[in-house]
Swiss-Prot record:
One of its GO terms (biological process) is cytoplasmic translation. One of the primary rRNA binding proteins. Required for association of the 30S and 50S subunits to form the 70S ribosome, for tRNA binding and peptide bond formation. It has been suggested to have peptidyltransferase activity; this is somewhat controversial. Makes several contacts with the 16S rRNA in the 70S ribosome. Pfam families: Ribosomal_L2, Ribosomal_L2_C. Part of the 50S ribosomal subunit. Forms a bridge to the 30S subunit in the 70S ribosome. The gene is rpl2. GO terms for cellular component: cytosolic large ribosomal subunit. Coiled coil: none annotated. Residues 194-233 are annotated as: Disordered. This is Large ribosomal subunit protein uL2. GO terms for molecular function: rRNA binding; structural constituent of ribosome. It comes from Picrophilus torridus (strain ATCC 700027 / DSM 9790 / JCM 10055 / NBRC 100828 / KAW 2/3).
Length: 233
């Protein structure tokens, strides 16, 4: 009798594949308008960026993705600011051309969707009916002027420069993000473990294309492709 493939075991939702959300800080979105003071800088599990613990005059606590150069007891402002400084959160319409911003909202009020990884930022290019930004990928994208963003670069730019050195350290890092530390090809498995497994040499042994309505356990390979991928051309 065959065994469940990895996709089926992941869908079952066991602890091996489930993200340890009890260790995470939750969704980090923009707080309400006001003046906040940085109370602490936290190294959050599951993230490659530090997180700021901020508090306002009403003693309301919020979390914010840290910017480069942040320090404890620093004041930051959130709202409609005419001349924003590094670390302030305001509308794209108020941020001058040539500025770098991060944690950019896709639509006004969603809390930030773009440029949230360590060391990244987008460049404000021009203003008009929409604000044009150059993203880290090199793509120019237009945003609504009422979308908010944080001025500056995200901290932790050297996160990827530090060598991991030990396999165990890498496994623990990936486990904090609920990712598998390795990938095994289907053709390298036994026939009992995968539809592509088995045989005297590594080969699929059947058409690798599968339809959209294929049942779980057989739905492996190229899913409903528009055309066949040709190698060596």
């Amino acid at each position: 009798m065959g065994k469940h493939i990895v996709a089926q075991r992941r869908g079952h939702g066991s602890l091996v594949y489930r993200s340890p959300s009890h260790r995470h800080l939750g969704d980090i979105k923009y707080p309400r308008d006001g003046t906040y003071k940085i109370e602490d800088i936290i190294q959050a599990p599951g993230r490659n960026t530090p997180v700021l613990l901020i508090r306002n005059e009403k003693n309301e606590k919020n979390y914010m993705i840290a910017f480069n150069g942040a320090y404890v007891n620093q004041e930051i402002h959130v709202g409609d600011i005419d001349s924003p400084a590094i670390g302030d959160v305001t509308y794209l319409a108020n941020i001058p051309d040539g500025s770098y911003v991060y944690n950019i909202e896709s639509i006004p009020g969603d809390g930030g969707k773009f440029c949230r990884a360590a060391g990244t930022a987008a460049l404000v290019i021009s203003h008009g009916a929409y604000v044009s930004l150059k993203l880290p990928s090199g793509v120019n994208k237009e945003f609504h002027p009422r979308c908010r963003a944080t001025v500056g670069f995200i901290a932790g730019s050297g996160a990827r420069d530090i060598p991991i050195l030990k396999a165990g350290t890498h496994i623990k890092y990936l486990q904090s993000k609920a990712k598998r530390p390795y990938t095994v090809r289907g053709v390298a498995m036994n026939a009992v473990n995968h539809p592509h497994g088995g045989g005297n040499h590594q080969h699929v042994g059947r058409p690798s294309t599968v339809g959209r309505g294929t049942p779980p356990g057989r739905k492996v390979g190229r899913l409903s492709p528009k055309r066949r991928k040709k190698y060596g051309r």
